[in-house]
UniProtKB/Swiss-Prot annotation:
Residues cleaved off as propeptide: 23-28
Functional summary from the UniProt entry: Neurotoxin that induces excitatory symptoms in mice following intracranial administration. No symptoms are observed after intraperitoneal and intravenous (tail vein) injections.
The keyword Disulfide bond is assigned to this record: yes
The protein, known as: Conotoxin im23a
Organism of provenance: Conus imperialis (Imperial cone)
Length: 72
């Protein structure tokens, strides 16, 4: 539960910074777990025990492409 709250807060901070700079992709690549692909971000997100839908939305929010076989 604490991990989810921490991750949510972290994502909000990153997305706020990304909105301010106008470049979410650049900001997302500064997050160590995102790597270079949407699949890497999705994989990391799932390992945090977050829902499939939440992870799909997260990857899309940072302007990366989630894995097509996992996200509709």
């Amino acid at each position: 539960m604490i991990m989810r709250m921490t991750l949510t807060l972290f994502v909000l901070v990153v997305m706020t910074a990304a909105s301010a700079s106008g470049d979410a992709l650049t900001e997302a690549k500064r997050i160590p777990y995102c790597g270079q692909t949407g699949a890497e971000c999705y994989s990391w997100c799932i390992k945090q025990d977050l829902s499939k839908d939440w992870c799909c939305d997260f990857v899309k929010d940072i302007r990366m492409n989630p894995p097509a076989d996992k996200c509709p």
